[in-house]
Amino acid sequence: MKKHHLIFITVLAVIVLFYKEYVALNLGIFGIFLSILTFTQTKSELRDRTFLTLFVTSIFSSFAFAWFGDEVSFLAVFVSLFLLRFRGTYPKLKPFLYIEVLLINLFSFLGRVFNIEQWYEKPKEGKSFANTFITFVLIPGLFVTIFFFIYSFGSDHFANLFRDSELDFEPLTVIILAVIGFYIGFIFWIFGVERFIFKQNHHLKDDFSDIINLEKPTFSFLDIDSERVSGFVSLSALNILLLVFVVTYNYEQFYEVTTSADTLSAETHDRVNAVIMSIIMAILVILFYFKNGFNFDEKATSLKISAKIWIVLNGTLVLSAIIKNAEYISGFGLTYKRLGVYAFLTMALIGLIFTFIKIQKKKTNAFLFNKMFWASYGLILVCSYVNWGGI
């Protein structure tokens, strides 16, 4: 099916589904419609396991939004559909770059829509149905609608012709829905990937493809041996500092008695924030030292051991915070904030696990970002599939 056919079908679907209809249910149906249409328009050789998984999650997310109609379910539908579309078109593009592609296409619509040759394919012989539709329906209908509104301002009786009729037709609503449908159809089916994005994709591989130069230090004022030693000393000192913090942190959480619920709430959130900030900084430090050569440096064994110990200690810190949050929930009930604490702590723990794998398997820093992208997507799906407010 040609691109402009897909756009017109999308416009028609938006008008039919959303004209004076309930948004949540019909948006779910629209999501299922786009998922199936994307599946049928994707080449069979590109329907790999990831694509099929995204197809299933798109269907489930659409059902979830039709049932719950909340913001998280809408986000899940939006992300799932565009991931499905991008994956079926550019499967070798790293998922982290899908965000950049989407943002560029969302805001470049006005510039690209006037490049008609990009999205409207002329028929080779004779007149196609789309050509006939544009000639006899779309263009005349557009002019009639514009002048209808012009004349409506000059005569109340003329304006009430449709308003007072049994058809109860609202042309303005149809036009707005058509514009929205065209915008959605255009950015969904006619998205472009710039050349610089393909160049960025080369730098986001999970594995090192070139021979890494171990003799090139990060800073000019430090040689490679000094940098290795500084990393070991830094991580060793941080391990000692973190060990002391873990002991004091757990003592304050599990042995000190809090006088009021408000005080306990404030202390819990402050400690969780400290844990999350500690995890982020820990991962950044490890990414700095293991960005290139030290992944393959035989002399960096002690540095790797120190980094793994630091990851384990940070993991212990996360587990302590999870246990304390569970205790807090059992005493004062479940709220969205406390569920949010679980979400952030879970993501922090997943980040530590992937950081450990990165060091163990000698992966690039991009490996961590690629995996965390899918982990974040999985978190959105979990949040959208369950009615947490009803628990």
For each predicted feature, which ranges?
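Membrane-helix interface motif
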Residues: I146-L161, V244-T259, L319-E327, G390-I391
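Alpha-helical transmembrane segments and their cytosolic membrane-interface
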Residues: M1-L37, A300, K308, N314-S320, ...
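Short aromatic-rich membrane-water interface segments that cap or initiate transmembrane helices
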Residues: D164-A178, A261-M277, L334-L345
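Transmembrane-helix bundle segments that line or gate the permeation/cavity pathway
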Residues: I15-D156, L177-N201
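Hydrophobic alpha-helical transmembrane segments
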Residues: K124, F129, I134, E170-G185, ...
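Membrane-embedded alpha-helical segments of integral membrane proteins
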Residues: I309, N314-K358
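Hydrophobic alpha-helical transmembrane segments in integral membrane proteins
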Residues: L381-I391
